[in-house]
Amino acid sequence: METIMAQNEILGKVAFATQYSHIKKDGKRETYIDAMTRVKQMHQEKFPNLWTQIEAIFQGFVFPGVVFPSQRSTQFGGIAIKRNNMRMYNCTASYVDRVRFFAEGFWLLMSGCGVGFSVQKHHVDKLPNLITKDQRDNRLNLVHVIEDSIEGWAEAIHVLTKSYLPSNEDEAKHCISFHYDQVRPEGASISIGGVAPGPKVLEVAIEKVRFILDQAVNQGQSRLKPIQCFDMFMHISHAALLSSRRAATIALFSPDDEEMMTAKTGTWWQDNPQRAYANISAQILLDGFENKSVFTDIIANARQYGEPGFFFCYDREFSTNPCGEIGLYPTFKDDQGNVSSGWAVCNLNEIVVAKVRDADHLLQACKAAAFLGTLQASYTNTGYLGETTKKIIERDALLGVSMTGIMSNPNMIFDEMTLKQCSKAVHDKNVEIAKLININPALR
């Protein structure tokens, strides 16, 4: 056991150095304490009235490695999160029910977030109609200059997709050409760390998305199919991956969608290698009318090809993050009853069980993790995503506290009374801190 723990600690240090540690002004990499200090100072600047409490949490639990803030806050804590609050969150979820999904999803991937998304038929059916072949072949050319930012890259995707899926006549008038000269060259440094991938990565994604759209138009389709939406976003995800960003994604689909059900069968890795960038799962409604044959088909495919998976729900509007451990509800209903879709987020902290001394120490670690998670939930400047997403995040203010290395002390972790006490401690601390910083307590 001690050997395994030592090996895990070494792997953890490697992961930290390669994925989370920044290069300092003196050219050296941050130590773990440096990185956590960066996160601590970010919270203290935002909440000066909680300066002492934040200091105590970091000194007592974070610096010793008992509690970890969200992975993304470790990676981007400081200026990067101040500029783009969505970098605080590990994962997100939404639906392909609006043209802006493709651009927003790209922006989130480039921000470091994982993306769960639904291509269920009832969501994809909400997209506008495709332009006709005659409309496409008789358009005026329009040059779009791509700005050198993640917003600029995302907007390029939006300009392209809305020209094929227009919501008005003006959007259908132009064939879009792209000007890439403002995009910094491959290898140039970027402000959040690392180097730029260069314009070719984006150009390839744009042209592959255009190919799918042109193919749909050439086939006389009036609407996109879920499999086409899936493939479009996978080409976009590949661009994020080649830009040294996360491309963690999961696609949820209708269980009667045969094309999605068989998306990873046959020689898909040769014909459609982009599909490797997402897990796919059928979303099965538990309403008492479940179709056993559909579930049998899923299992048969999974035994042969490893996918698809299945995602049980009581509401088809529920979604999940790529890890599949949390339900997310990315819609908002206003006072007039109008429903709009946006993005819901996963807000997760971690307790390292191997560093926990006893049940009382675990209880205190849970309170510390809940304290940090509640602070994290207050970062709701959603920027490119707009007001609907801001309202969803502020309404839910979700909080997750997970435990890693549970088998290092199973007697403590699997004790029912201890777990109930920990759950109550997380809830109570969340309510306390949410009131202090004037946000909603976690919806769940």
Tell where the protein language model's regions lie, with residue ranges:
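Extended catalytic cores of very large enzyme megasubunits
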Residues: 1-444
